[in-house]
Amino acid sequence: MTQRSQIATSFLPLPGSAPVEWRIEPGLTAYPDALAFMEARAEAIRSGGAGEMVWLVEHPPLYTAGTSARIEDLIEPDRFPVFSAGRGGEYTYHGPGQRVAYVMLDLKRRREDVRAFVAALEQWIIGTLAAFNVRGERREDRVGVWVVRPDRPRLPDGSPAEDKIAAIGIRLRRWVSFHGIAINVEPELTHFGGIVPCGVQDHGVTSLVDLGLPVGMADLDLALKSAFEDVFGPVAALPAEVARKTG
């Protein structure tokens, strides 16, 4: 099987397609509200009643369980609310200081290839991190984007320590995607301690600020947009983004 690192990651739409709507939500978004919005929007995209969309949000502290989540990986079930997400993957944490990008795209207009779509999402994240001179890397045995930590002791097997900086969890229904990615800007990293993030015990989590970078959410959002257009094509910003930048 072809490794994800060898898959072509261009997911440009068919010629003549409308730009992807790009919306930045102010404040904290309740997770049930986000689920309801994504379900409705994905159905509207499938039926032709709405266009593709990327929705950037922050959530209050919570854990979500993907379809592969194991109950033993929920270490502190009473620490934060726990939601069944319906996406792929295992447990993850969302909270303030973490940018969640919900990606609602019609892959019939792009490429009907799930593995290539995951690789494209990883490339989007890697391109975003590169704007801050952070080398994000993919791993064939685990989804997400990782950074090597030469400042940390090596693992027992002698391999370099590495931390996860971004998670990916998606769902496709009749080739329309929803759910998406999460990048750690400045979340409270101790909040990840209530779970085994994504079922991976041997590696930790990090953030842009933890890596020593003075990056804010607005900085990340600009980099996200530029890197998204490289992989997925043009976007059209909604008024919410303008309000966020000037508010």
Swiss-Prot record:
Chain residues that bind substrate: R87, G88, G89, E90, Y91, T92, Y93, H94, A167, I168, G169, G180, I181, A182
Q: Which residues cross the membrane?
A: none
Sorted alphabetically, which InterPro entries does this protein's record hold? aa-tRNA-synth_II/BPL/LPL, BPL_LPL_catalytic, Octanoyltransferase, Octanoyltransferase_CS
UniProt keywords (A-Z) are: Acyltransferase, Cytoplasm, Transferase
Task: Give the principal location in a single coarse category.
Answer: cytoplasm
For this protein, the Enzyme Commission number is: 2.3.1.181
Q: Which residues form the BPL/LPL catalytic domain?
A: 48-236
- Family of the protein in this entry: Belongs to the LipB family.
Q: Which NCBIfam families match?
A: lipB, PRK14341.1
**Protein name per the record:** Octanoyltransferase
Species of origin:
Mesorhizobium japonicum (strain LMG 29417 / CECT 9101 / MAFF 303099)
- The record's gene field reads lipB
